[in-house]
Amino acid sequence: GARIDGQAGVVLDVLTYYSNIEVVAFFDNRVVSKGATIQGIPIIGDIDKFSKFDNSKIDAIHVSIGDNKARYDIYKKLKPNGIPFISVIHPTAVISSSAKIGKGCFIGANATIQNNSIIGDYTIINTGTIVEHDNVIGDAVHMAPGSCTSGRVKIRDLAFLGVGSTVTPDVCIGKAAFVNAGTMVKKDIDDGITVAGYSSKIHFKNIYLDIEG
């Protein structure tokens, strides 16, 4: 993705802290004008044009899209190219030496990941998010700014935690579940369910319910 007012802009800003990393191109499935750039970096075109790009210029890939399913699908599409997926980590993030971070992740400013926690591939741990000890966070999860999990929480693949949401100890959040902003989750949530409010009331099954694999 190449939205400077979205996840791409956040990722690009973090990469300015790393003098050994140069962003050589963006790919974006939206229609963009010929010759378009972001801060002087060319937008080549949609992801289908990736195979035609000079891959000798690419050492690693990062997919900067906030939407879980879109991000996950693009990573799967790019995987056969054999180019490594890089995790982008803000220098102010605090990560325990015993935590494990998967490939293609984004860890935002002032995020905290505590001891023995595991973060799956392609997951976003956004600004100021707290992942407490002994958590298991799946692939392509998005924890929005200020969200917080207590100890021993499990979050399955493709789940989303909204801004300022909290999860109490030992809770499991199902695959592709959606937790609205400010919600406190005190009990397990099934796959594909959207919840909201202090008591995490079930509202409806969300749009990702049909995800397989």
Regions found by a protein language model. Give the residues of each.
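Glycine-rich adenosine-cofactor-binding loop
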Residues: 1-13
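Glycine-rich, N-terminal phosphate-binding loop of Rossmann-like dinucleotide-binding domains
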Residues: 2, 64-66, 109, 198
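Short alpha-helical
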Residues: 6-7, 69-70, 100, 184
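Short amphipathic alpha-helical segments
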Residues: 11-14, 39, 73-77, 119, ...
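NAD(P)-binding Rossmann-fold cofactor-contacting core
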Residues: 18-37
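Phosphate-bearing ligand-interacting subdomains
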Residues: 32-94
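Structural signal for interior beta-strand "rungs" in well-ordered beta-sheet cores
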Residues: 87-203
